[in-house]
Amino acid sequence: MGASERSVFRVLIRALTERMFKHLRRWFITHIFGRSRQRARLVSKEGRCNIEFGNVDAQSRFIFFVDIWTTVLDLKWRYKMTVFITAFLGSWFLFGLLWYVVAYVHKDLPEFYPPDNRTPCVENINGMTSAFLFSLETQVTIGYGFRFVTEQCATAIFLLIFQSILGVIINSFMCGAILAKISRPKKRAKTITFSKNAVISKRGGKLCLLIRVANLRKSLLIGSHIYGKLLKTTITPEGETIILDQTNINFVVDAGNENLFFISPLTIYHIIDHNSPFFHMAAETLSQQDFELVVFLDGTVESTSATCQVRTSYVPEEVLWGYRFVPIVSKTKEGKYRVDFHNFGKTVEVETPHCAMCLYNEKDARARMKRGYDNPNFVLSEVDETDDTQM
């Protein structure tokens, strides 16, 4: 093995060792420190808000019953189906009890031994079971058979009208609530996916934070707009501690951040400049930061014209410094564009400055050198004083 081959071999071993050490350091920070100090999220990766309201008085809780429609829509499916079944069974039983009372007051029950030529309020109600079945037939409108109302009692006629109207209201409300629950744009938001990790690398000569987002449906989101909020704990000059201090984070794509053409996966990025809250962070100190980056995507569903919002969040362990996303869009032989979602969240390591301040300081130094303000080739030397020429 010659000297040149040995030097190449040493360089290769050194590069592999540095990369292995970097991966081990990243794994150690993520799995050891990440587990020992689990960060609290305001927004989960799926977009659910992790917030709990405590010490809410009874008067404030009553507001939820005033806005009963929104309360029913926000119920989980198991509670909604419980309310659905309880509403129908409860109304059938309640009106069955009222029909039994009508028959009892009018002495139509067999225990009163009514004469054969006497016309009852409701024919063939012999007890609570038959009264419940008559209530079910009335409210569901399946048609009368053996039991029916006569014109003998005005109370029975009024109760029949009242139950029919109330049954229509219950049917409309409960069926409408289930239909609205199914058609909520929240379900459309499930087909919008974000990358598990955010990356920081150079893009267009600038240091950027990049996130990949994809629409799993072929139908578009009209008027899509994407933005972010950086949540962290800050202390004001007056000494006040703000737990969830919000800072606006502007995200753009190459075509701008308004009216995105969201037909294929997009890589959105935030430029880390002097106005960015990430400007003073570095690769070595990123995992030690305490922040949460919440990303929002607003748009209008093309098929229903309903507005939906998709949310996700990133904590420092989920931001990879010095990586970029793998390309996933290719062109087939048939002339179609193919998206490989197998590599949607995959990243590759790239050469990246370890801090934004270093990148911009280097650019400023180069600019000063071009203008002659900082020229290392210019050397100032002392000149000996000479006497004036004597005449």
From Swiss-Prot:
Binding site for ATP: G223, S224, H225, I226, Y227, G228, K229, L230
Keywords, in A-Z order: ATP-binding, Cell membrane, Glycoprotein, Ion channel, Ion transport, Membrane, Nucleotide-binding, Phosphoprotein, Potassium, Potassium transport, Transmembrane, Transmembrane helix, Transport, Voltage-gated channel
Lipid bilayer topology: Multi-pass membrane protein
Non-spanning membrane segments, not crossing the bilayer: 128-139, 140-146
Catalytic activity: K(+)(in) = K(+)(out)
Post-translational modification: Phosphorylation at Ser-44 by SGK1 is necessary for its expression at the cell membrane.
Residues recorded as bearing Phosphoserine in the entry: S44
Keyword Transmembrane: yes
Membrane side Cytoplasmic: residue ranges: 1-77, 178-391
GO molecular function ontology, one term from the record: inward rectifier potassium channel activity
Transmembrane annotation, as ranges: 78-102, 156-177
Region called Polyphosphoinositide (PIP2)-binding, residue ranges: 180-207
Chain positions carrying an annotated carbohydrate: N117
Topological domains annotated Extracellular: 103-127, 147-155
Subcellular location per the Swiss-Prot or TrEMBL entry: Cell membrane
Ways its activity is controlled: Inhibited by WNK3. Activated by phosphatidylinositol 4,5 biphosphate (PtdIns(4,5)P2).
Residue ranges annotated as motif Selectivity filter: 141-146
Site (Role in the control of polyamine-mediated channel gating and in the blocking by intracellular magnesium): N171
Function of the molecule: Inward rectifier potassium channels are characterized by a greater tendency to allow potassium to flow into the cell rather than out of it. Their voltage dependence is regulated by the concentration of extracellular potassium; as external potassium is raised, the voltage range of the channel opening shifts to more positive voltages. The inward rectification is mainly due to the blockage of outward current by internal magnesium. This channel is activated by internal ATP and can be blocked by external barium. In the kidney, probably plays a major role in potassium homeostasis.
Family: Belongs to the inward rectifier-type potassium channel (TC 1.A.2.1) family. KCNJ1 subfamily.
Protein name, entry field: ATP-sensitive inward rectifier potassium channel 1
Originating species: Rattus norvegicus
Gene: Kcnj1
